[in-house]
């Protein structure tokens, strides 16, 4: 803006100079032509004829003055040439390279404004206020449905948040899946000055389901047509974006374009950058009617209030009905109908400069739109191939996209200073809890972790599960970090039932996981595995938070609380379903124990039966889990009895007991105060006992722990004395809380701890 104003000041100075120099010159000459109140002729011949006081000296002075006048006139002509040159360059300076490329094609938009600006001298804009006020809220509408689109929305939102300087209000037209995912994401993201409202896309299906559509976006690709009806009646304007958009500038610049709309202009669109609507892409290609190349609807500026007054709903419906009589279906979803309406009513559209929607489709000509990185504003991956689209600059665009794809979303939780924000009750409570902590406490970081809100993306990959008729399904629940990713395929081979996994990853690691999963035939063949990403924050591994996330998002009545390092026996899923019925788990408070074993061998011939397992146990190939370092953890399972047991048997709780159990989904959550290594499962089993769960060992079930390198947290536990001191303090506080919650019955836990 500063550069534009400087250019205009130079323009103004040149104009003033052009006007002033001749005036000053002629005033000087006019004044100098009087001597003693009488006019003096500038012509030497006339002076000689009429002035008796003519001298050789005055003759030289007048000749000198005439030379000076000719020099001034020459300077005047030079200034005129510079001024005309400045006029010719003014629009290019104002718009960058874009006006050169698309000046003829943007006749209804910026090029007209530029021509008007040249006539007006462009000087008035220097002192104007910015088109978007500092704290003005920018409204953005996005249609989103399904698991994959939810991932795309996150990348789009990151790119918008990265550049934004204004409060944002997202209006998300989402199906039930996307709403669950994105509502949790935004709630845990806790970005200041961002509001999100959801609108049920399933309720809007009837509005557009009558339109046959061949586009890969399906019925949801038509829902932008009904935004005037869907969005709040008091919302006057909105920016509508596709999910495959990436911003490279502040969205406020696009919002400011609304101020350029004139007359009946209600739609801001960029011209389509392919020949699709010209109908020459292949033989017998018959596109929907469009004005010239047509317009792309990946980025739309909608003046909702005016559209409602124009009866937009009736306008697009009549147009669609008429065209469908001949076209039979849409090929590009809502875009075909928008273009058909514009063809009949060209006055509705304000043509945006092409850099607001640089389209990377298979037949794009978008390279004509940009000549420099600074020209790019919005990138649109509008090809079914997405990042694999063919384009000579695709590597540059892909890197820009990957920047936001892998960008740490936690860094976007920055305040907009000077802008009042709506009170967030959850955030206020969080700040209050944190303020009550003593920062000088040596265990402050442990205590703080309990209140940390981790950004969470549920169902990172497609999830689908059909429950059984007998309602006995069991979900395997586990948590992991990037270093345990290799266990996923093995677990999927051993467990055919549904799985709920919480993965503790950074944004970049989440993309590595996505590539790993999409490249795995085993994982891609399974639709009943729910992957929930909990993004990294803080210095500790929030093991119990991860377990709670995985537990909370299961779709079965029962769950098997396992760990990622264990492989369940083949057929365990079906065996547990039968045991659920046998032990009447639906109507009793029981925790079914699956005995745990371990091997020290990375390559193991996995036992296919209990008999094989006992044989390997006797040969020393297998051991009871942690028998040599933490015997108390699983001793109450009574492995000696299990060897010969043929029916389930009950065991009593003992200090430090931490078996792996199958319980109903309504069991208590894990205590979040325990992070990293130590006491995280022990505390949970203690609470189950306090709630009077019966611990029943299954005689024909088993699981085997596979060897792996020590985790970072167990290394800290073993090497850091303060870590162990804080863990002991947290244990004592947990036991005190148990006493307060469960009264006299909880005293046995204090006694057991003292005796252990």
UniProtKB/Swiss-Prot annotation:
Q: Which residues form a coiled coil?
A: 53-95
Q: Where is the composition biased (Polar residues)?
A: 44-58
TM region positions:
11-31
**Name the UniProt record assigns to this protein:** Xylosyl- and glucuronyltransferase LARGE1
E.C. numbers: 2.4.-.-, 2.4.2.-, 2.4.1.-
**Region (Xylosyltransferase activity) residue spans:** 138-413
Top-level EC class as recorded in UniProt? transferase
Glycosylation site list: 97, 122, 148, 272
Where on the tree of life does the source sit, at the highest rank?
Answer: Eukaryota
Gene Ontology molecular-function annotations: glucuronosyltransferase activity; glycosyltransferase activity; hexosyltransferase activity; manganese ion binding; xylosyltransferase activity
Name the Gene3D superfamilies for this protein: Spore Coat Polysaccharide Biosynthesis Protein SpsA, Chain A
Q: In which pathway does it act?
A: Protein modification; protein glycosylation
The record lists the organism as Mus musculus
